[in-house]
Amino acid sequence: MKNPTLLPKLTAPVERPAVTSSDLKQASSVDAAWLNGDNNWSTPFAGVNAAWLNGDNNWSTPFAGVNAAWLNGDNNWSTPFAADGAE
């Protein structure tokens, strides 16, 4: 018997509300990093630093201490490793 409270299929379209600079200014616990001048941003909610890049839902989170931000689809990235200066 199927559970009627199951989440919708993953293939359903996902809608994200638009985030404005005004929204971010009002959120005192949000540390926003604006990337590429096109409203890309990342915030540390509950230990998750999700970077939404280029409006195509690409994102990264600090699993096992890794915080990789992939920018512009050209493999530029940054990490919080003290000795790592990879670009």
From Swiss-Prot:
Modification(s) after translation: Kawaguchipeptin A contains a D-Leu and 2 prenylated Trp, whereas kawaguchipeptin B only contains unmodified amino acids. Kawaguchipeptin A is prenylated in vivo. Upon expression in E.coli of the whole operon, Trp residues are prenylated by C-prenyltransferase KgpF. Prenylation by KgpF is likely the last enzymatic step in the biosynthetic maturation of kawaguchipeptin A.
Lipid-linked residues (3'-prenyl-2',N2-cyclotryptophan): 34, 41, 52, 59, 70, 77
Coiled coil: none
GO biological process: defense response to bacterium
Residues in cross-link Cyclopeptide (Trp-Pro): 34-44, 52-62, 70-80
Record's keyword terms, sorted: Antibiotic, Antimicrobial, D-amino acid, Lipoprotein, Prenylation
Residue ranges annotated as propeptide in the record: 1-33, 45-51, 63-69, 81-87
Taxonomic superkingdom: Bacteria
D-leucine carried by residues: 35, 53, 71
UniProt function note: Both kawaguchipeptin A and B, which only differ by post-translational modifications, have antibacterial activities, since they inhibit the growth of the Gram-positive bacterium S.aureus at a concentration of 1 ug/mL.
Remaining remarks: This peptide comes from bacteria isolated from a broom on Kawaguchi lake, hence its name.
Descriptive protein name: Kawaguchipeptin peptide
Lineage of origin: Bacteria, Bacillati, Cyanobacteriota, Cyanophyceae, Oscillatoriophycideae
